[in-house]
Amino acid sequence: MTGSHRTSHAGDGAPEDDLGTFQTLEQFILDRQDSFPHSTGAFSRLLRDISLAAKIVNRDMRRAGLLDVYGSTGERNVQGEVQQKMDALAHREFVQALRRGGECCLIGSEEHAEAIPLSTVSKEGDGKYIVLLDPLDGSSNIDVNVSVGTIFSIYRLPDGYEEEEPDPAAALQPGTEQVAAGYVVYGSSTMLVYTTGNGVNGFTLDPSIGEFLLSHPDIQTPSRGRLSSINSGYYHSFEEGLRDYLDWLQQKDPETNRPAKTRYIGSFVSDFHRNLLKGGIYMYPATESSPAGKLRLMYEANPMGFIAEQAGGAASDGHRRILEKEPDKLHQRTPLFIGSEEMVRRAEAFLQGEPERALSA
């Protein structure tokens, strides 16, 4: 990571006085509220509700080995994927937290076929936010104790929306319309990282006081990284341009940080978080079996794309900017190339059959 950040935090044996050097998430939101174009108390409360749900999920994650929350529910979600018990639990916690708060009128979740209406829309401005999320990304890794995460994206109802009952179609907005996005990574420590379009900031949960504390202010990702994250087991099902790019990454050239180091956990949040801080590219391309890609545009690619761009990186489907894609359904899939800008632009050039443009970059 090239931006400055604190590397220790209260709860690691630091004196109590050191707490004064840290800012809580709630304090940070209130301090920045005036610089946010949609500044309202409702938005601040919405972020508080999301962070509360994340704390509850984190608590249950820490006790997963002692509770009956490993394994699957025996059911499949709308994606056709086997639903893990922690998937269902995390979905329930986020829905309950957002329903209690009243700031969110619609929630779209990976675990539910349609957007869920949560509240009516008031003329005073309450209930005008839409939250799209993957409640627990990488949940198949839980029973082997690998880091997992939550991804969320926040929109407002379109200007001029007059209906009291929220229309699920209102959730289908391009990523450029996001007012905030973030993720939580449940790892050796629990971090919440988010943006409102004014940079990216990270907060580490101090379990001793139950607060997210600012630990990574103004995150900037290196423009050129050395990490490559992709499931290379599908190499022979990738299109030729991508295979050429992967081969190029493994050639030795210190001037362009090659050969790249391959790091792939299989948990999108964890892989993205590492590459955001250290510099690299995460790739989940189209394959023969998934020609439209595998990741979901609305609650995986768009929020992470917003964060990547705000940190100085880039996000593309290989041919165009992710945030500009027009959605036609909640669970729409997309290929994704995201991370350090120079690496994403080179990947695009190879995919578009212009390797000479990549080599001259």
From Swiss-Prot:
Residues annotated as binding Mg(2+) 1: 110, 134, 136
Pfam families, A to Z: FBPase, FBPase_C
Enzyme nomenclature, EC number: 3.1.3.11
Pathway the protein contributes to: Carbohydrate biosynthesis; gluconeogenesis
Localization of this protein: Cytoplasm
InterPro entries documented for this protein: FBPase_C_dom (IPR044015), FBPase_class-1 (IPR000146), FBPase_N (IPR033391), FBPtase (IPR028343)
Any one Gene Ontology BP term: sucrose biosynthetic process
Gene Ontology CC terms: cytosol
Catalyzed reaction equations: beta-D-fructose 1,6-bisphosphate + H2O = beta-D-fructose 6-phosphate + phosphate
Entry binding sites for substrate: 137-140, 231, 264, 294
Cofactor(s) this protein requires: Mg(2+)
Class of enzymatic activity (EC top level): hydrolase
Keywords, sorted A to Z: Carbohydrate metabolism, Cytoplasm, Hydrolase, Magnesium, Metal-binding
Gene3D superfamilies per record: 3.40.190.80, Fructose-1,6-Bisphosphatase, subunit A, domain 1
Cofactor note: Binds 2 magnesium ions per subunit.
Residues annotated as binding Mg(2+) 2: 134, 137, 300
Membrane-spanning intervals of the chain: none
Chief place where the protein resides: cytoplasm
A Gene Ontology molecular function term of the record: magnesium ion binding
Keyword Magnesium annotated: yes
Domain of life of the native organism: Bacteria
Family: Belongs to the FBPase class 1 family.
Subunit note: Homotetramer.
Name of this chain's protein: Fructose-1,6-bisphosphatase class 1 2
Organism: Salinibacter ruber (strain DSM 13855 / M31)
Gene name linked to the record: fbp2
